[in-house]
């Protein structure tokens, strides 16, 4: 057992083999994340340590590390690769520490900085989220972009040659069809433009001839009214016809004074006013209580036989 040198001054049995100091779990996570840390008894038995990862045999300081609840330290990438090689239906108890065969997942009732850091790191991969009881992360499937953009079939060129004669008749048919759709007089188009000016706009396309095409767009977007302003105004001033002659409560003026009209911002004047009102009410209540108690005490004293001088045997009235 030893005392950690951090400001917390916690008693701990953990010992950093590299810096040769006692460390608590808070310092272990903050300042000794890549150090070999075990119990002080192990240090007394054997002070030698291996600074390399036991999975890839490279320095632990070269990559990101992950410390299990048994305090064994590994490269996070090596531990992740080792876990992904197991079958997807492996139970959480099947994930074991490569060094001491301890559990990889911290117990649910364990509360410590090391366990919290390990849970946060394990929650980033799917194989560990299932063991922690978290929903899996959806992995987007890569889109195959190897499809050719030009999918034109040039195998049958005879169809193009045979239909070349029919293409010459297409402009005439197209012009006739266009005339059928564009047979709207100019006056009618302008009339529709003048009528629909207030509701929706009209676009007039004029050709070289006397034909034109009028395209009426959809109605303009409706205006959205904010009902919160109306509700806010009702809270501030209530002066409707139905409520104008309604009987108000007796203490409505007091509630109106005590209510904070400025929202979260309180003015000094309103605070002083509320304080004075509360003070006056308190004084009036105190005086009323004193008056009531005095009347009740006098009434009880008048009816008390012990205070009646005629009933006192030691007092003789009208006798010599």
UniProtKB/Swiss-Prot annotation:
GO terms for biological process: vesicle-mediated transport. It is a single-pass membrane protein. The chain crosses the membrane at residues 275-295. Residues 1-274 are cytoplasmic. One of its GO terms (cellular component) is Golgi apparatus. Belongs to the ZFPL1 family. This is Zinc finger protein-like 1. It comes from Xenopus tropicalis.
């Amino acid at each position: 057992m030893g005392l950690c040198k951090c400001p917390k001054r916690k008693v701990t049995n953990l010992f950093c083999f590299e810096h040769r100091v006692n460390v608590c779990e808070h310092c272990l996570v903050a300042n000794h994340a890549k150090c070999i840390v075990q119990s002080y008894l192990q240090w007394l038995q054997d002070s030698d340590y291996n600074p390399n990862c036991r999975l890839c045999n490279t320095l632990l300081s070269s990559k990101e590390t992950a410390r299990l609840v048994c305090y064994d330290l590994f490269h996070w990438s090596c531990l992740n690769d080792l876990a992904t090689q197991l079958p997807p239906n492996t139970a959480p108890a099947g994930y074991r520490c490569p060094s001491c065969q301890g559990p990889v997942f911290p117990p649910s009732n364990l509360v410590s900085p090391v366990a919290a850091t390990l849970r946060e790191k394990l929650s980033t991969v799917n194989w560990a989220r299932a063991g922690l009881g978290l929903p899996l992360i959806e992995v987007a499937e890569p889109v195959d972009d190897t499809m050719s953009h030009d999918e034109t079939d040039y195998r049958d060129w005879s169809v193009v040659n045979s239909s070349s004669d029919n293409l010459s008749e297409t402009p005439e048919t197209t012009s006739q069809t266009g005339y059928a759709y564009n047979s709207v007089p100019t006056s009618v188009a302008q009339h529709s433009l003048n009528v629909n000016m207030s509701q929706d706009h009209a676009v007039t396309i004029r050709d070289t001839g006397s034909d034109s095409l009028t395209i009426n767009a959809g109605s303009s977007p409706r205006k959205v009214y904010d009902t919160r302003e109306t509700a806010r105004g009702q809270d501030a001033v209530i002066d409707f016809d139905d409520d104008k002659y309604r009987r108000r409560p007796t203490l409505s003026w007091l509630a109106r004074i005590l209510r904070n009209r400025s929202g979260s911002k309180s003015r000094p004047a309103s605070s002083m006013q509320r304080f004075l009102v509360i003070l006056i009410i308190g004084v009036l209540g105190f005086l009323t209580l004193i008056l009531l108690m005095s009347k009740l005490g006098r009434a009880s004293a008048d009816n008390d036989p012990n205070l009646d001088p005629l009933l006192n045997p030691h007092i003789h009235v009208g006798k010599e």
